[in-house]
Amino acid sequence: MKCHRCGSDNVRKMVDSPVGDAWEVYVCEKCCYSWRSTENPVVMEKFKLDDNKIANMGVIPPIPPLKK
């Protein structure tokens, strides 16, 4: 199986449906894209990633604590 966003073969099943075999969720270990087996994942060309884009991605800042 290949990632629909970056084309990597490094994809793993993250979780199974809690009810029967309704669906599975897969995640790409390279770009963190995830999708359900029941979805038809379509990634628009401008959102696809390559090695250069992944290497230059910014770091996502942590979520600050809630104010009391």
From Swiss-Prot:
One example of a Gene Ontology biological process annotation: response to toxic substance
Entry keyword set: Aromatic hydrocarbons catabolism, Detoxification
InterPro entries membership: VdcD-like (IPR047707)
Induction: By 4-hydroxybenzoate and 3,4-dihydroxybenzoate.
Signal peptide location: none
Additional detail: It is not known, if phenolic acid decarboxylase forms a complex composed of ShdB, ShdC and ShdD. The term subunit is often used in reference to the operon, however there is no experimental evidence to prove the existence of the complex.
Task of the protein: Involved in the non-oxidative decarboxylation and detoxification of phenolic derivatives under anaerobic conditions, however the precise biochemical function of ShdD in metabolism of phenolic acid is unknown.
Name of this chain's protein: Protein ShdD
Source species: Sedimentibacter hydroxybenzoicus (Clostridium hydroxybenzoicum)
